C-alpha cells in the first residue's frame, strides 16, 4: 500500500517528468494486483483467523479493484471453491454449448471477447476481464450466487463506498493524474489477475467431483512474479488446501508430484496463455472445448497430456 500511496502522490504533485508516468502506472498496477492476492489469502484464513479482521483487511486489499469483501466471500470462497469447474454452476467457468446457444448475452461475450479461437480481440478479456466479471457478479449475485436480498444490498453499498472513494480521489488529483494513478494501473492489475484466473481452470475439463487434480492447473512464473502474486499460480495446491498459507505451496507441490506424478498438471504461465489463445472456450462436453463460430474442437487438458491437441474442425 505504501508503494501505491507514494507513487500516487508523486503523480499528483508532478514530482516526476511526463515520460515516467507510465512507469509509475505499471508499478501501481503491480501493487494493485499484489493487494488483491494478499486479500485472497486473507479471506481464506491463511493470514488472519478472526472474521472481522479478515473482512476489514480484505476490504482494504480489494479496494483497488472495487470488490466488496462480502461479495468475494460468497463468490470465491463459497461458490467457486465448492463447485470448481462444475459446468454452468462455477461462476468463474466458461459456459456449456447449451448455455451458449440459449443465451444471447453469453454468445456475444464468447464470440467477441473470450480469449480463444485465435481472436486478438480476446485479449480484452485480460485487460478488462476482472472488472467486467466482478460487475456482472455484483449485478446477478442473487441469481448466480443465491445471495439473499439483505446480503445483496450490503455488497452493493460496500461497492458504492469504494466507488465514492475513487471518485473523490479523482476530484482531488484531477483527471490526468487519476488516469495514471488509477485507471491505467487498474488495466495492468486486470491483466495480471486474469492471466492467472483464466489459465488456472479454463483449459481443464468440467467435473462434478470438484477434483483439483483434474479441474485445475498450476502455472509457473519467474520468482519475482511469484512474490508479487503470493504464489497464486500454485492453484492445484490451493484448491486442495485453500486455508493453508501460500508460503507452503512449493512443499505441497513436491508432495503432489511424488504421490501423483501422472495426474498433477502444471505448465509455464506463458504456455498456458498461448494454449488458451489457440483453443475454444465453450464446453461441448466435459472434455471437449469448442469454438462455435468456427466449428473447431479441442480436447481439454487431461492428466498425462502435454501437447496442444489439434483442432478437429
What are the functions of these language-model segments?
Residues 1-29, 62-179, 246-313:
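Non-catalytic, topology-defining segments of multipass membrane proteins
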Residues 10-14, 34-37, 41, 167-171, ...:
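Short hydrophobic alpha-helical membrane-anchoring segments
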Residues 13-38, 56, 60-70, 186-190, ...:
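Membrane-embedded alpha-helical segments that form the functional core of polytopic membrane enzymes
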Residues 30-39, 68-72, 129-138, 182-210, ...:
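Transmembrane alpha-helical segments that form the membrane-embedded catalytic/substrate-channel core
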Residues 38-53, 77, 82-95, 136-150, ...:
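Cytosolic-biased juxtamembrane loops and peripheral soluble domains of multi-pass membrane proteins
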Residues 48-56, 72, 187, 248:
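Short acidic-hydrophobic sequence patches enriched in Asp/Glu that either
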Residues 175, 235-237:
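Short, surface-exposed connector motifs at secondary-structure boundaries
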Residues 232-233, 241-244, 248:
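ABC-type nucleotide-binding domain
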